[in-house]
Amino acid sequence: MLNRFKIYAVVFLTALFIAFAPPAEVSASAGELADALRTAIENMDGSLTVYEDADFDLDAFVEEFDFAGVSKWELNSARSQRDLRMVWDFAYNEVYAIRKALEDASFEQKLSPRQAQVLSECRAFVKKNIPDKLTDYEKEKLIHDYLCVNVSFDEETEEERLSGIISDDITPYTAYGALFNGTAVCEGYANAAWVLLTLSGVENHIVNSDTHAWNLVKLGSRYCHLDVTWDSSETDLTGTIQYTYFNLTDEQMTRYPEHQPVNAGLPPADSEAYNMYFNSGMRAGNLADVERIITAACEAGERNISLWVDDHLTFDYDWQRDLQFVWDLTPGGNYVESFMFVEPGADRDTLTVILYMR
């Protein structure tokens, strides 16, 4: 989910965040204030003190200023006969802060304790589990699988958000929540994937819609969409790692209302070369393909079978009817005692069939 800012305007002075250096003090017009704020944010300063000596609309300024990189800011102000003294305090977005620390090690001392823990934990994970000899695709898959298995979607936080309840606890929106608590909403998943992929040498970007967040990953010279959050939820549902939202194109991804990017200037994702199902022969173009793929997988010993179904919204599939052939499967003389399935729909292109054998 998107970051949420809280704004406080009070008539007394207090410092709510520890400044990493003595707060800068400047006398500012609107333009000078904007420059001072941009410099403070670029330097990850904890605080900035500004004296306004020009008459301008502060509310309009705040509405228009781009606080990119800041997860929370607070403004405390007091007006004298001559000017307005403003003290700005900042806390920084997890990905912004860690990116700065990776670009310049001196910024590590400016990370919050939790951000420092995330960076340390991710470095240890990459060192232990992701050797340099792996391809970027293999690194991405390993990270995807790890997060799908070890992180669960935070339903309670999501329900609160949908109900308009805004909590002071932003942990579920962070990589810290995903990696240390094992629960997160989409932003936490995307942040964790970003840190792990970046430390593994895989270029990626966080993509935001109005209600969701995921990653755009560069593999070779092409880009693909990766939504670990939705694959993790399907993994919990089916009991096996799912790849429904693993390396999709723009066309495939943006069919879903939640996947309408608001980011400007994203590179196009137009290759199916890294789609898991397409590369493994698990792509069905019609019902005959569905039967062929499931039968072959069953005979090979698979009991939890997922496949991509093209154009499933166009054709009149009745999966309760169309999967009756499963009862006739007898791999190694074993019979199907029961089976369950998760069918394709408006928000997924994969069919998952789980077989229980006698």
Protein language model features and the residues they cover:
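His-Asp-centered catalytic microenvironments across diverse enzyme cores
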Residues: 222-224, 229-325, 335-338
